[in-house]
A protein has these predicted regions:
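Conserved acidic E/D residue at the C-terminus of a beta-strand in Rossmann-like folds
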Residues: 66-67, 134, 158
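C-terminal hydrophobic helical "lid"/dimerization subdomain
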Residues: 118-122, 161, 165-213
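Structural detector of well-ordered beta-strand residues that form the stable sheet scaffold
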Residues: 40, 63, 129-131, 155, ...
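Glycine-rich phosphate/adenylate-binding loop and adjacent beta-alpha elements
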Residues: 1-3
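Glycine-rich cofactor phosphate-binding loops and adjacent beta1-alpha1 units
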Residues: 31, 73, 78-153
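Mid-domain Rossmann-like dinucleotide-binding core that forms the NAD(H)/NADP(H) cofactor-binding site
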Residues: 10-88
Length: 213
């Protein structure tokens, strides 16, 4: 078991954000992200956004990809330098231009969409590292010849491995500002309505926290 003390300056209603932040951090750690590298992140939900902000903290350059324009605009407002709408932009060409032809040394797949999982191979550089943290509902066929040709490393990432202390520190020092990611805080009796609202308007929310009173 892991026991981590919540810093005094992290409000109780924001502390649960540490758990999804550990998922984002673990995905980056699994891919062994380094300063100066380009990190393409597919999925601009809470985990994808925090992966982008954490990559920036590690002095890498994040490129965040999604099909929800509102999430991309919000990420850009928070300082993510490159955002791409997969529904509109020519993502491969755009990343080629951003990276001066090398493509991304690290790719984080945080959407779970089968098509996005397949596309990670095209976004990665030669000898690139791909970290899969999204949960697909079905199997995805991948061209193994491309994996071999580009010498890609594919790594699953589904949990955290000692990242809670780092996550809490980042929340405490506002390297990741919890207010930027928690869209709404509700009481326990408000959860059913919050779930309906989230299901109806997913573009409006990143993370909803429920608290005891």
């Amino acid at each position: 078991t892991f026991n981590s003390k919540i810093p005094d300056n992290v409000p109780s209603e924001m502390a649960p954000l540490a758990e999804p932040l550990t998922i984002a951090l673990h995905a980056l750690h699994r891919a062994n992200v380094k300063a100066g590298e380009y990190v393409a992140i597919i999925g601009a939900g809470a985990i994808g956004l925090m992966a982008a902000l954490s990559a920036r903290h590690y002095k890498a350059t994040p490129i965040l990809i999604d099909i929800v324009e509102e999430r991309l605009r919000y990420a850009q407002k928070l300082g993510v330098p490159y955002v791409l709408n997969a529904a509109d932009d020519q993502v491969i060409d755009a990343i080629k231009n951003i990276t001066h032809g090398t493509m991304a040394q690290v790719v984080i797949e945080a959407s779970g969409a089968n098509s996005a999982i397949r596309n990670t191979l095209d976004l990665a550089s030669f000898a690139g590292r791909i970290s899969f943290t999204g949960w697909p509902k079905q199997e995805t066929s991948l061209p193994t010849n491309l994996i071999t040709y580009k010498e890609l490393d594919l790594r699953g990432s589904r949990t955290s491995a000692g990242e809670f202390d780092e996550a809490l520190r980042m929340l405490s020092t506002l390297e990741i500002n919890p207010q930027d990611v928690v869209s709404k805080v509700v009481n326990l009796d408000e959860i059913p309505d919050a779930v309906k609202e989230l299901d109806r308007y997913p573009e409006r929310y990143l993370k909803i926290n429920a608290v005891f009173h």
